[in-house]
């Protein structure tokens, strides 16, 4: 890849009300002083699925191959790349070391496919701390849950 490759910062977060339950995801993309916020909702999901969905949608929002600094407070997402879990899972036909199937294979496979287009640096951030963009993602994700469940209270 050339030296002229764009560098983009992507912050992501997922949230779930109950696990499983209604969930929201969000990503904030930063590029040359421009900020783009994206978020979405799923009716019945898990926190880990929302964390993965946030990363997938953040990367999908890129229009061309980029160098990406991707920030997440999800150990599940970051460790899968940093600790080599994904390579092991693929080598073992998507089975964990205890021989049970890896959860969320559909999203992991989608994430692997889309991340091939980019040079991704996976960065763990502390959740609910003082990181402006991680906190923004958290607010956007939880707002999706509130907005989409307000009409259908379960109580």
Swiss-Prot record:
Residues annotated for Mg(2+) 1 binding in this entry: 13, 51, 73
Chemical reaction(s) catalysed: Endonucleolytic cleavage to 5'-phosphomonoester
Taxonomic source organism: Thermoanaerobacter pseudethanolicus (strain ATCC 33223 / 39E)
Chief subcellular location: cytoplasm
- Give me the comment on cofactor binding: Binds 1 Mg(2+) ion per subunit. May bind a second metal ion at a regulatory site, or after substrate binding.
**HAMAP family xrefs:** RNase_H (MF_00042)
State where Mg(2+) 2 binds. Answer: 13, 138
What the protein does comes down to: Endonuclease that specifically degrades the RNA of RNA-DNA hybrids.
Q: Which UniProt keywords apply?
A: Cytoplasm, Endonuclease, Hydrolase, Magnesium, Metal-binding, Nuclease
Q: Where in the cell is it found?
A: Cytoplasm
Q: Which Gene Ontology cellular-component terms appear in the entry?
A: cytoplasm
Instruction: Name the enzyme group at the top EC level.
Output: hydrolase
Q: Which residues form the RNase H type-1 domain?
A: 4-146
Q: How does it assemble?
A: Monomer.
Q: Name one GO biological process term.
A: DNA replication, removal of RNA primer
Record's Gene3D superfamilies?
Ribonuclease H-like superfamily/Ribonuclease H
Q: Which GO terms describe its molecular function?
A: magnesium ion binding; nucleic acid binding; RNA-DNA hybrid ribonuclease activity
> Mind telling me what this protein is named?
Ribonuclease H
InterPro entries for this protein = RNase_H, RNaseH-like_sf, RNaseH_domain, RNaseH_sf, RNaseHI
Q: What sections of the sequence does the record tag as coiled-coil?
A: none
Which PANTHER family does this UniProt record tie to the protein? RIBONUCLEASE H1
Its cofactor is: Mg(2+)
Q: Does the keyword section mention Cytoplasm?
A: yes
SUPFAM superfamilies (UniProt xref) = Ribonuclease H-like (SSF53098)
EC number(s)? 3.1.26.4
